[in-house]
Amino acid sequence: MKLRDSLAENNSIRLQAEANTWQEAVKIGVDLLVAADVVEPRYYQAILDGVEQFGPYFVIAPGLVMPHGRPEEGVKKTGFSLVTLKKPLEFNHEDNDPVDILITMAAVDANTHQEVGIMQIVNLFEDEANFDRLRACRTAQEVLDLIDRTNAAA
């Protein structure tokens, strides 16, 4: 499942969302996947449990997090949600706080997680200007167009 296709088919883009805590921000992303029948509601708690156990493991770049759990923690099918925050939040990461872009990922197996999910996110943000381009998006279509332009250039 490609990032762009998942976001479009699952209607799982939320821009300029408001959240007061990192937990609320993560819940917005997971709730989009629950609504699209990609994950079970328990996926949210699994992500929180992972942070409790391993720390903020999904803070992957300045301003960017990729919340995700394990396939057996409620994943029904592979999918993504994308959330931008109106106000950046602290995720307790020494180097990459504050965060205002969340790409929540659900993968049916570890191979999909590594090869499909992470590589597509890396591709999108290989051009660092895409961080600001994404922050400037105000409609889901603008996000999809940005991903299309990035994929065309790759």
From Swiss-Prot:
Keywords: Cytoplasm, Kinase, Phosphoprotein, Phosphotransferase system, Transferase, Transport. The active site is at residue 68. The keyword Metal-binding does not apply. Gene3D superfamilies: Mannitol-specific EII, Chain A. GO terms for molecular function: kinase activity. Pfam families: PTS_EIIA_2. Induction: Induced by L-ascorbate. Repressed by UlaR. The modification Phosphohistidine is found at residue 68. It is found in: Cytoplasm. Residues 6-150 form the PTS EIIA type-2 domain. Its main location: cytoplasm. CDD domains: PTS_IIA_fru. The PTS EIIA type-2 domain is phosphorylated by phospho-HPr on a histidyl residue. Then, it transfers the phosphoryl group to the PTS EIIB type-2 domain. NCBIfam families: PRK10372.1. The phosphoenolpyruvate-dependent sugar phosphotransferase system (sugar PTS), a major carbohydrate active transport system, catalyzes the phosphorylation of incoming sugar substrates concomitantly with their translocation across the cell membrane. The enzyme II UlaABC PTS system is involved in ascorbate transport. This is Ascorbate-specific PTS system EIIA component. It comes from Salmonella typhi. The lineage of its organism: Bacteria, Pseudomonadati, Pseudomonadota, Gammaproteobacteria, Enterobacterales. The gene is ulaC.
